[in-house]
Amino acid sequence: MSQKKVTVRQVGSPIGRKPEQRQTLQGLGLNKIGRTSELEDTPAVRGMIRKVSHLVEVVGE
């Protein structure tokens, strides 16, 4: 059984953000504006996206 995937793109800078938000972006595999990352659609990943929703956008589900 294959997991569903979710693709996220970084649209905001981590400069001046809290360390927790920087670490969350790194956990999502993002480090520069415009980069995308394809991740498995799990509750943990959804929670991470929700934590930094002002810095990322969901491109595809």
Curated annotation (Swiss-Prot):
Give TM regions: none
InterPro entries linked to this entry: Ribo_uL30_ferredoxin-like_sf, Ribosomal_uL30_bac-type, Ribosomal_uL30_ferredoxin-like
Q: Which domain of life is it from?
A: Bacteria
A molecular function annotated in GO for this UniProt entry is: structural constituent of ribosome
Cite the Pfam families for this sequence: Ribosomal_L30
Q: Which GO terms describe its cellular component?
A: cytosolic large ribosomal subunit
Question: What does the similarity note say?
Answer: Belongs to the universal ribosomal protein uL30 family.
| NCBIfam families, per the entry | rpmD_bact
Name this protein carries in UniProt: Large ribosomal subunit protein uL30
Species: Hyphomonas neptunium (strain ATCC 15444)
